[in-house]
Each structure stands twice: as C-alpha cells, then as structure tokens.
Amino acid sequence: MMKLTKLFLATAISLGVSSAVLAADYDLKFGMNAGTSSNEYKAAEMFAKEVKEKSQGKIEISLYPSSQLGDDRAMLKQLKDGSLDFTFAESARFQLFYPEAAVFALPYVISNYNVAQKALFDTEFGKDLIKKMDKDLGVTLLSQAYNGTRQTTSNRAINSIADMKGLKLRVPNAATNLAYAKYVGASPTPMAFSEVYLALQTNAVDGQENPLAAVQAQKFYEVQKFLAMTNHILNDQLYLVSNETYKELPEDLQKVVKDAAENAAKYHTKLFVDGEKDLVTFFEKQGVKITHPDLVPFKASMKPYYAEFVKQTGQKGEAALKQIEAINP
C-alpha cells in the first residue's frame, strides 16, 4: 500500500525535523504463506534489502510471513484491490481463476525448471496467462523462481512403479496430488499437514509426498526410512506486485523493483537447488535409503488423468498441455 509522505514531509520540515529520520516515500508490504525459516522468506528479505538500497531508501518493504495477512487466495485479492503490494503464488495456483492453469501441476508435465520457465514465458498459453493476471486480477508478474520438486517417502522401498501398488499415500486434498497417488496405483489418503507425522509414526499411512525441504522441516525422515526420487510435481514461485502499486512508482523505481525481483528469484532458485542436493546427503546420514525408480512408467500411468484434464478444461487445457509437452526434453 502506498504511503503518501508529502504532507508528512511538509509538516516535519515546519517542525524542524531532520529529513534523515523521515519515512520512506513508499512504505510497502510483502505477504506470504511461508515462515521465517523458509527459503521463500530468505529470498524475500534479499528482495526487500536490494530494493531499499537501490532506491536509496525511497522504498521500504515490510515482510509479513506465516499467512499473517491470510492465505494465498486472500493475498491475491488484496493485491487486486491495492491493500497489499507484493506476494508469492505458484503458477498452478491460478487455476483458481483459470482452470487450464492446473496444467502446471499435472504430474510429470513439467520435467524440469527450464521447462517451467519456457512454459510460462515462451508458450502462447503462458503469455496469455500473464496478460490475464494483469488485466483481470490486477497483478504484474515480476519474476519466477524454482520452489522444489515433490518426492515420495514411504515405509518400504519403492524401486519401481509396482511398489506403489496399495501404498496408503498421504496427499493434500488437491486434485493433482490425489491423481498422482491414484494413477500410480497407490491408495490416496487426504489428510491435514499437521497430522502427517503422527500418521506416519503409527503406520496409519504408509507414505507421503512433498518437496525435500518439507520432509526435513517436518522431520518425516525420523519415521520414514525410504525416499523415492519420483520427481512427480515441480513447484515454482512467482514474485507478484499489485498493479496499483507498480503503476504509482516512477519508471526508475519500477526498474529497481523489477531488477531486484529477478535477482531475488535467482537466489531463491539457488537456495532450493543447493538445498535439495544437501538434503539427499543429509537423509542418507539419517539412515534413509534413497531409490531412483524408472519414471517412464510413472509418466505413462498419467495418460488417463491428462485426458480427464482435457475433458474438464476443453480446448484451452488441451492447447496448454500440447504446448508444454512440445518443449519437454
């Protein structure tokens, strides 16, 4: 939210207050779901610091982690009405408004982060989505970052897709995650995230799927001794700014914000890439056995789900899927 300072400045000068202690010209807010120990927060801190430095103190960004301002849907609405300035959202999250955007979370459709970038910025589908974010939702996309890839932990080794059969797999209550479990032959078991550790510990479920950072943060490795690198859903994170905020900034400060967001996204991506490499070593030291099943049968098992997606989303969904599949290696 823009903070108007002209009146304050005039008043301060009349009272003899030094300009050195005056507030920034633009006092902005960045809301996010992630907590203070997360890579997202660390990258947002870097973003805020660079913006302040490069704007010579004209822009001050305060961070609001841990869903203090609501969930991601609520924060996107706040960006639209101008009551919040910045937030994060995954590309797939825009399925809330455009069902075809769920393509970003279809298991095995986005094979790596390079594909994720091309899917968003190079395909006609991606370019159109960015335009709709701007026109319909009142948000400008500043940059995209890698945010981890979902893997599968279990109480038995997963060496091939055959080992998934009958596995009671905890998943969030989201269509794409439920579909992953269902079509690879597991038994999907939706459950609140806060309940997962105990469910794994008591064998109420046999496994779960999450990015490696979440596996470590929640200490699932204490109660699951097998980790299969299933690479089934790649997550990204978009740096978003309210159009109302962005358009009120002078052109030179818009560039400061844009450049800082791109730099923060690179740092964000590095944190996750380096972190995932380190975490594999960490889990091995904790006695977790890492397996690398052949993923070709996993992807092949998703064909019925892709057909279901196309049926639900029509020509837009079909076009999105074809365009992204065309850039997969």
Swiss-Prot record:
The keyword Metal-binding does not apply. Residues 1-23 form the signal peptide. Keywords: Periplasm, Signal, Sugar transport, Transport. InterPro entries: DctP_fam, TRAP_DctP, TRAP_DctP_sf. Pfam families: DctP (PF03480). N-acetyl-beta-neuraminate binds at residues 33, 72, 90, 150, 170, 210. The keyword Transport applies. GO terms for cellular component: outer membrane-bounded periplasmic space. It is found in: Periplasm. GO terms for biological process: transmembrane transport. Disulfide bonds: none annotated. The complex comprises the extracytoplasmic solute receptor protein SiaP, and the fused transmembrane protein SiaT. PANTHER family: PTHR33376, SIALIC ACID-BINDING PERIPLASMIC PROTEIN SIAP. Part of the tripartite ATP-independent periplasmic (TRAP) transport system SiaPT involved in the uptake of sialic acid (N-acetyl-beta-neuraminate). This protein specifically binds sialic acid with high affinity. N-Acetylneuraminate (sialic acid) can then be incorporated into the lipooligosaccharides (LOS) as a terminal non-reducing sugar, protecting the bacterium from complement-mediated killing by normal human serum. NCBIfam families: dctP (TIGR00787), TRAP_S1 (NF037995). Belongs to the bacterial solute-binding protein 7 family. This is Sialic acid-binding periplasmic protein SiaP. The lineage of its organism: Bacteria, Pseudomonadati, Pseudomonadota, Gammaproteobacteria, Pasteurellales. The gene is siaP.
